[in-house]
A protein has these predicted regions:
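Zinc-dependent metalloendopeptidases
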Residues: 1-261
Length: 261
């Protein structure tokens, strides 16, 4: 049963920069102990392999090398930030750097995660850099890694991308999503349909399905028709907006604390 299929305006994703994608360009294997190995299909954007619009799997050269080695990327504890501490720095060229300050304060005040200014003692760190898109790798990659931010990306988008850097995937890509949502691929440009593939998680899905997660796509993500591409199969809780970028939900906090106990 579909709960909501109303016509609504398409969210202006150009402002956030989270939905800059392209045609499918290839695939890479990723896996976990809990769910085995799965193939992720990605788009080639700015010489990067981009998954689901804003997740950086690596450079195209890195992906090509991985494919030649027939390797599988195993996600899990190795990609966690030790002691839940994430050193960061901000590129001086980043427009509106206060949004990073606000996003850091949001994570630090609501979770046990601590984003701290980078010092010379920090070999692994995140650097916030200007870009035409907003995107991040998932989890700690080692050395310097970037969170790219579009010029108009709001604080909520910064919080979202920081969630990826911590190790959180998109909520609507959970293993159990079919019980809660239906995806209308007929309303999505065929070149962008790969963005709705389900990922391989690095553990069991945490808690109940969270429509209000800051890690959830908005209902009209990648829509070409003005109608929802993500439809609820169960009632969305009162006051909850699918795809909101206002604040971490209780479910987001729980997920962060589960992978950083």
């Amino acid at each position: 049963m579909i709960i909501d299929d109303t016509l609504r305006p398409v969210i202006d994703t150009d402002d956030t920069g989270e939905f800059h994608s392209g045609p499918e360009a290839g695939s890479v294997l990723i896996g976990s102990v809990a769910h085995g190995v799965r193939e992720l299909r990605y788009a080639a954007v700015d010489d990067l392999a981009i998954f689901e619009g804003d997740i950086v799997l690596g450079t195209l050269d890195e992906i090509d090398a991985r494919r030649r080695q027939e390797g599988v990327v195993i996600s899990g504890a190795v990609f966690r930030w030790p002691n839940a501490v994430v050193p960061f720095e901000v590129d001086p060229a980043l427009p509106a750097p206060q949004r990073v300050v606000d996003a850091v304060a949001h994570w630090n005040s609501r979770t046990r995660i601590r984003f701290v200014p980078r010092t010379g003692a920090h070999g692994d760190f995140v650097r916030f850099v200007p870009s035409t898109s907003s995107r991040s790798p998932v989890g700690r990659r080692g050395g310097r890694q970037t969170i790219e931010l579009a010029p108009s990306a709001p604080v909520g988008t910064v919080v979202h991308e920081m969630g990826h850097a911590l190790g959180l995937w998109h909520e609507q890509s959970r293993e159990d999503r079919g019980n809660f949502i239906a995806v209308r691929l007929d309303r999505v440009d065929p070149a962008h349909r790969h963005n709705f593939d389900q990922h391989i998680t690095d553990g069991d899905d945490v808690g109940g399905y969270d429509f209000g997660s800051i890690m959830h796509y908005p209902a009209t993500a990648f829509s070409t028709t003005g109608q929802a591409t993500i439809l609820a199969r169960v009632p969305v809780p009162p006051g909850v907006t699918m795809g909101q970028r206002s604040a971490l939900s209780a479910g987001d906090v729980n997920a962060a604390h589960t992978i950083y106990p």
